[in-house]
Design a protein with these regions (language model features):
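Short coil-to-beta transition motif at edge beta-strands of beta-rich domains
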Residues: 19-29
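Compact nucleic-acid interaction/catalytic patches
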Residues: 26, 34-76
């Protein structure tokens, strides 16, 4: 039986155009047709999964103040000084190559995003 070779850790490789991005980085919405109402998306995927070609994102929407939203699912998030609502129930993977340049990082607001995902998964 041949001797096994030791496992060697290798840095993740990224598809052309992909790059590592931090959890809670905020990017312009790559869907130009939806960008008026949903100007940004936030990466909620763990940095441990950077080698994947997609990123789990949560849309950040402009909502009229008169519209009542369930705050457990749609918490308010401040991005570049503007209040938006995270739409946890619309979280979806996007190709990493479509997320070009981060405009903000909302890691200081991570707990409300995590609570919103928890509400989607276990409290709705």
């Amino acid at each position: 039986m041949p001797a096994s070779r030791p496992t060697v850790f290798r840095e993740p490789t990224f598809a052309r155009g992909d790059s590592p991005m931090a959890q809670y980085d905020v990017f312009p919405n790559p869907s130009h047709s939806a960008a008026d109402g949903v100007p940004y998306v936030v990466v909620i995927q763990s940095d441990l999964l950077d080698a994947l070609s997609t990123r789990l994102t949560m849309p950040l929407a402009k909502l009229d103040a008169a519209i009542k939203v369930p705050t457990a699912l749609c918490p308010g998030i401040v991005v570049k000084g503007k209040r938006l609502h995270a739409l946890a129930h619309y979280a979806a993977p996007l190709p990493a190559k479509n997320l070009r340049r981060a405009v903000d990082n909302v890691s200081a607001q991570a707990s409300v995003l995590e609570s919103a995902m928890d509400a989607v998964m276990s409290r709705v």
